[in-house]
Amino acid sequence: MEAYKVREAYKEWANKQSFDLFITLNTEAELTKEQMGKLMCKLFYKTECDVFGYSNREKYRNKLRIKRAVVIEGDEKRTHAHIQVKTLKGFTNEQMIELLKLEYMKLLNTKREKSFLFHATQISNRDAVSRYITKETNKQNRKLNDVIDLRSSFISKHSNKQ
């Protein structure tokens, strides 16, 4: 498939997911892509356990999860993550942002709030956000990698049903 068609397919798929928030996460230390992926897994695992409780999360693995698509950019230097997140039922976008921000700062063991580590906004233009996070599609496909980090993302199996 041609490069622009692959990128367009990613964009269309992301738009169908109806994510609410766009979050960019950085770290003070240089991390590899794998380390950043593990950090994202830990962030969402801990957040889900805080919200749903450990036993409920384990019992209802496909229901009690935060729907998200994680893209990790940067190969060796300045590795960072772009995440599209669906706000949980019963939460406002602001509450969801605050929840993830507090958990991320706790995970990094950061005492002071540093704006470059966590930046979140409500998605107002899905096309623009989807294009932005998939800008490295061609580069990753040449390396036989997926632009979306499937290990730290969570997309329900039935997310394409309307």
Language model regions located:
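Right-hand nucleic-acid polymerase module
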Residues: 1-79, 87-162
